[in-house]
Amino acid sequence: MKVIFLQDVKGQGKKDEIKEISDGYARNFLIPKGLVKLATEGSVKTVKNRKIVQEQEKDLAIAETKQLKTLLEEIILKFKLQINEGKAFHSISNQDIVDQLKNSHKIDLDKRKFVNFKNLNQIGLHYIVIKLGFGIEAKLKVEIQGV
């Protein structure tokens, strides 16, 4: 019996997968529990169309992420730290960076996307790695100046 999986079934199939299953297993277990439905021409077309739409949405999201990466890598964020005798009285946290990106560049990021981030308290140019998703990482430049 040809069925369409409505959700993931361990050892059998994944959601929206079309697969041939034994009649008894499908009728007695999978269909009554709402895990699968019969694969008719209309339902198969619907599943294929849904997969095409999902693929297009994923491609669009990847393109937007790549565009965000390009934008982030062009930005240089500047912070000023009060320094006395070579020691900083304050440090720049990932939340400070997120806030400045949001306020000055209208870019909204989650502070948990920063890779191996440690608060910045040294004068100079720092590179921050940010995971954007889909395996794409951006290097943001942060310049700290002493006051």
From Swiss-Prot:
Q: Which InterPro entries match?
A: Ribosomal_bL9 (IPR000244), Ribosomal_bL9/RNase_H1_N (IPR009027), Ribosomal_bL9_bac/chp (IPR020594), Ribosomal_bL9_C (IPR020069), Ribosomal_bL9_C_sf (IPR036791), Ribosomal_bL9_N (IPR020070), Ribosomal_bL9_N_sf (IPR036935)
What name goes with this protein? Large ribosomal subunit protein bL9
Q: Which domain of life is it from?
A: Bacteria
Where does this protein come from, organism-wise?
A: Mesoplasma florum (strain ATCC 33453 / NBRC 100688 / NCTC 11704 / L1) (Acholeplasma florum)
Cellular component terms per the entry's GO annotation? ribonucleoprotein complex; ribosome
Q: What does this protein do?
A: Binds to the 23S rRNA.
**Which GO biological process annotations does it have?**
translation
Upper classification of the source organism reads: Bacteria, Bacillati, Mycoplasmatota, Mollicutes, Entomoplasmatales
So what family is this one in?
Belongs to the bacterial ribosomal protein bL9 family.
Leader peptide range in chain numbering: none
Keywords on record: Ribonucleoprotein, Ribosomal protein, RNA-binding, rRNA-binding
UniProt-recorded Gene Ontology molecular function terms: rRNA binding; structural constituent of ribosome
Q: Which residues cross the membrane?
A: none
Which Pfam family would be a valid example here? Answer: Ribosomal_L9_N
